[in-house]
């Protein structure tokens, strides 16, 4: 059974456009492999952070909306924790 989720994650501001695109594609592919569908991704661009995170004052915001089983969300968050590119993330379940 799948549920609707929204995930917002913040990438380091010093990444190149190529690495940003590769990172976004990696997480979209990870979700698809875990049974998520459809993955809608919005690249929100570089924004100033309200406070410093891991010594960064800016971050690149990316939002994903998708239907997925809870195991897919767990795998995605595990990948975020292990990634050096992601400085913060949040996943919430959308209400119908």
From Swiss-Prot:
GO biological process: translation
GO molecular function terms listed in the Swiss-Prot or TrEMBL record: small ribosomal subunit rRNA binding; structural constituent of ribosome
Cellular component terms (Gene Ontology): cytoplasm; ribonucleoprotein complex; ribosome
Domain of life: Bacteria
Keywords for this protein: Ribonucleoprotein, Ribosomal protein, RNA-binding, rRNA-binding
InterPro entries per record: Ribosomal_bS6, Ribosomal_bS6_sf, Ribosomal_S6_plastid/chlpt, Transl_elong_EF1B/ribsomal_bS6
Signal peptide: none
Family the UniProt entry places it in: Belongs to the bacterial ribosomal protein bS6 family.
Role noted for this protein: Binds together with bS18 to 16S ribosomal RNA.
HAMAP family reported for this sequence: Ribosomal_bS6
The name this protein goes by in its record: Small ribosomal subunit protein bS6
Source lineage: Bacteria, Bacillati, Cyanobacteriota, Cyanophyceae, Gloeobacterales
């Amino acid at each position: 059974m799948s549920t609707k989720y929204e995930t917002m994650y913040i990438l380091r501001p010093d990444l190149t456009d190529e690495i940003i695109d590769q990172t976004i594609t990696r997480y979209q592919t990870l979700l698809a492999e875990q049974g998520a569908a459809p993955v809608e991704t919005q690249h929100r661009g570089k924004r100033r952070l309200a406070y410093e995170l891991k010594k960064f004052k800016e971050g690149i915001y990316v939002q994903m909306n998708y239907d997925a089983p809870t195991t897919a969300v767990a795998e995605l968050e595990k990948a975020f924790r292990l990634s050096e590119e992601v400085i913060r993330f949040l996943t919430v379940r959308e209400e119908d």
